[in-house]
Design a protein with these regions (language model features):
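N-terminal FAD cofactor-binding segment of flavoenzymes
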Residues: 1-6
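Short beta-strand to alpha-helix junction loop
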Residues: 9-31, 159-169
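A conserved short coil-to-beta-strand element within the FAD-binding core of flavoproteins
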Residues: 40-55
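Central helical "cap/lid" subdomain
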Residues: 63-116, 180
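FAD-binding beta-loop-beta segment adjacent to the flavin cofactor pocket
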Residues: 134-140, 187-216, 220-222
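Flavin-binding catalytic cores
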Residues: 138-143, 148-194
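A conserved FAD-binding loop/helix module that cradles the flavin
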Residues: 208, 213, 218-242
Length: 244
């Protein structure tokens, strides 16, 4: 039985102009947050509206008082935290949040290649992105993002942290398809999102209750693309300003 090589064909396509943050994908958000108090790595335990302001209790029992509250979290988490204060039209939405598993790797001594991303027709590997193509930095190290298919992620999302086979299989698929040598990989890290995105969208772009001043914006309102999050946030901002 002879060996049958795998082939894939590259095709360059012209597309609309794209914009990305120079330092990172969240560079624009960080710019607009300058001068505003921020708190990170703080999990919200519960929220309460006392008819005057919001009381936001963190898991360390710290209470933050705020005139308004805006959620950007996945739909299942939103319902747990804010069910008491949301309109039924939001609570009754049929939102199917889908998972993904992503592995980041660094490849030493890699020459620059004219590729930004590759999509695969595979049951496990959905696509890979060549991060160096964004021209944010100069490096002899090739940085790649490897993302699984939704179907496979649904099977593995609850075990990827404790089972190294999940990460190893994603990397193995990447190596087989690209020809990059395993011994060239000097860094690898895998992360999963159980509620990554909603590919079907919803009838709404955002939600704002001007009486209680609770708002919701998220990509799952609109679709699975990165810009869906911005479009939802922009729509919420317009609603807040309209009813200010």
């Amino acid at each position: 039985m002879g060996w049958k090589p795998f082939r894939f064909y590259l095709q360059k396509k012209d597309s609309d102009q794209k914009f990305i943050g120079r330092i990172g994908n969240n560079a624009i958000s960080k710019y607009y947050l300058k001068g505003i108090d921020q708190k990170y790595q703080s999990e919200v335990k519960n929220i309460f509206n006392n008819n005057y302001f919001w009381e936001i209790t963190l898991t360390n029992n710290e209470v933050i008082k705020s005139k308004s509250i805006i959620f950007t979290c996945p739909f299942p988490q939103l319902k747990i935290l804010a069910k008491k204060y949301l309109n039924k039209k939001i609570l009754n939405l049929k939102i199917d949040m889908e998972p993904n598993i992503t592995t980041m790797i660094a490849v030493k001594n890699q020459k620059d290649i004219p590729i930004s991303s590759i999509k695969f027709n595979d049951d496990i590997l959905a696509w890979v992105a060549y991060e160096n193509s964004k021209k944010r930095f100069r490096s002899s190290v090739g940085l790649w993002t490897i993302q699984s298919t939704v179907k496979w992620a649904k099977k593995k999302i609850n075990i990827y942290k404790i089972n190294n086979k999940v990460e190893n299989l994603l990397i193995s698929k990447f190596i087989n398809f690209t020809g990059i040598k395993k011994n060239k990989i000097i860094f690898k890290k895998t992360h999963g999102w159980k509620y990554s995105y909603n590919s079907k969208g919803s009838p709404y772009k955002s939600y704002w209750d001007r009486k209680t001043r609770i708002g919701v914006c998220a990509d799952w309102f609109i679709g699975s693309k990165v810009e869906s999050a911005w479009l939802s946030a922009n729509d919420l901002a317009k609603k807040i300003l309209r009813f200010k």
